[in-house]
Amino acid sequence: MAKMELSKAFSGQRTLLSAILSMLSLSFSTTSLLSNYWFVGTQKVPKPLCEKGLAAKCFDMPVSLDGDTNTSTQEVVQYNWETGDDRFSFRSFRSGMWLSCEETVEEPALLHPQSWKQFRALRSSGTAAAKGERCRSFIELTPPAKREILWLSLGTQITYIGLQFISFLLLLTDLLLTGNPACGLKLSAFAAVSSVLSGLLGMVAHMMYSQVFQATVNLGPEDWRPHVWNYGWAFYMAWLSFTCCMASAVTTFNTYTRMVLEFKCKHSKSFKENPNCLPHHHQCFPRRLSSAAPTVGPLTSYHQYHNQPIHSVSEGVDFYSELRNKGFQRGASQELKEAVRSSVEEEQC
C-alpha cells in the first residue's frame, strides 16, 4: 500500500512538472508572437541636404552661370564636408511578425512651429534633430511572392499556441481528477499527443518566418532594407517556448508509460494472488468486454488468460479495482460454502 501511494505521489509530481512546462511554453510563445523584437539591427539612411541645423558642416561656393564674373548672374552652390559613411545616418530598427518599426529623425525645417521651443532645448543639449519612430505592417513590406508563406507561418503559430493551451487544460484537469486513474491515463495520453503536435507546428512556424524575413531583407523596399541585422530576444524566447513544449511532452509520455506498466503489473498480480476468480473470469470483466469477446468455457489456468490480448489499457484500468474486489469476494464466499458443506457432511455422518 505504501508503495502504491508513493507511486501515485511521483505520478502527481510528474504531471505537475508537465503542467508548469506547458504553462511556460504557452506564455513564452504568446509573448513572442505579439512582440516586435524578433529581429533588430540598423538601417543606413542618407543624411538630408544642407539646412540650418547642419550649416556648420556646409559651405557656400558661388558659381557663375554664363562664365561671367558679374555677381548678379552667379548662383550659390552648397558643399558638404562629410564624406564616406559620414554622409549616412545609422538608425535602429526592430521587426516582428506583425509590425516593423524604424527610428526616424525629424529635421528642424520640418518641425511644427509649436515644436521650435522643444528643438531649441534639444539643440542646446547637442542634439540636431528630434527622434521618433515609424511603424509599418510587415505584411506590406514582404515581397508578394512570400506573403502566402508569411500568412501560413502566422496561422501555424496561432495553431501552435492553441494546441499548447489545450494540452495545458488537459494536464490541469488531470491534476484535479487525481481519484480516477483511468481518466488520468486518458488525459495524459491526449495531453502528450497535443504537446508533440504543437511543438512540431511551432518549429515549422519559426523556420518559415525566418525565411520570409531573410527574403524581405533582400527583396523588400529599398528604404527599409537593413544594413546590419541580428536576432532579437523574441526569437530566442520562441525557441525557448519550443524547448519547454517538447520537455512537457516527454514528461507526459513518461508519466503515461509508467502508469501503463504499473497497471499491467497489478493486473497480472491480481490473478496470481486470486486464482478463484479465474473460473469466473468472464464475470469479473465489465459488460462491454464480455459482450465483445464471448467465453467458450471456464478457464483452467492462469497462462490461458494471460495470453489473451487486452482491448485497451484504459479498459484494464477501469475494471482493475472492480476485478480485485470481486476476486476477494468470490474467494471468501467459496471458502464459506466449503466450510458449510463440510459441516453438513460431518452431521450426516
From Swiss-Prot:
Main location: endoplasmic reticulum
Sorted UniProt keywords: Endoplasmic reticulum, Membrane, Transmembrane, Transmembrane helix
Gene3D superfamilies xrefs: 1.20.140.150
Superkingdom of origin organism: Eukaryota
Residue ranges of the TM segments: 20-40, 158-178, 189-209, 233-253
GO cellular component, one term: plasma membrane
Keyword Endoplasmic reticulum belongs to the record: yes
Bilayer disposition of the protein: Multi-pass membrane protein
Keyword Thylakoid attributed: no
Pfam families for the chain: GSG-1
Subcellular location: Endoplasmic reticulum membrane
Alphabetized InterPro entries for the sequence: GSG-1, PMP-22/EMP/MP20-like
Oligomeric form and interacting partners: Interacts with PAPOLB.
Family: Belongs to the GSG1 family.
Known role: May cause the redistribution of PAPOLB from the cytosol to the endoplasmic reticulum.
Protein name, per record: Germ cell-specific gene 1 protein
